[in-house]
Amino acid sequence: MKVEELIERINYLYKKSKEEGLTEEEKIEQAELREKYLKNIRSNFRAQLESIGGVSKKQS
């Protein structure tokens, strides 16, 4: 799933949760999508820092 699609789905589920609520399956999906998005952000940020140089790789 592309980042744009991921964000679109996260936003859709957020809006739906505010308007009418989510099913248990949708709540699980929302949590999984958010975690996937955050992992992507962390990975990109780490790669950017490493490209600058002088940053040691640390296990998280």
From Swiss-Prot:
Reading the lineage from the top rank, the first entry is Bacteria
Q: Which InterPro entries match?
A: DUF896
**What SUPFAM superfamilies is this protein classified in?**
YnzC-like (SSF158221)
Keywords attached to this Swiss-Prot or TrEMBL record, sorted alphabetically, are: Cytoplasm
Gene3D superfamilies, from UniProt? Answer: Helix hairpin bin
Instruction: Please give the positions of the paired cysteines in each disulfide bond.
Output: none
Classify the main location.
cytoplasm
Question: What GO cellular component entries does it have?
Answer: cytoplasm
Name where it's found.
Answer: Cytoplasm
Family that this chain belongs to: Belongs to the UPF0291 family.
According to UniProt, the name of this protein is UPF0291 protein CTC_01690.1
Protein's organism:
Clostridium tetani (strain Massachusetts / E88)
Instruction: Kindly list the organism's lineage.
Output: Bacteria, Bacillati, Bacillota, Clostridia, Eubacteriales
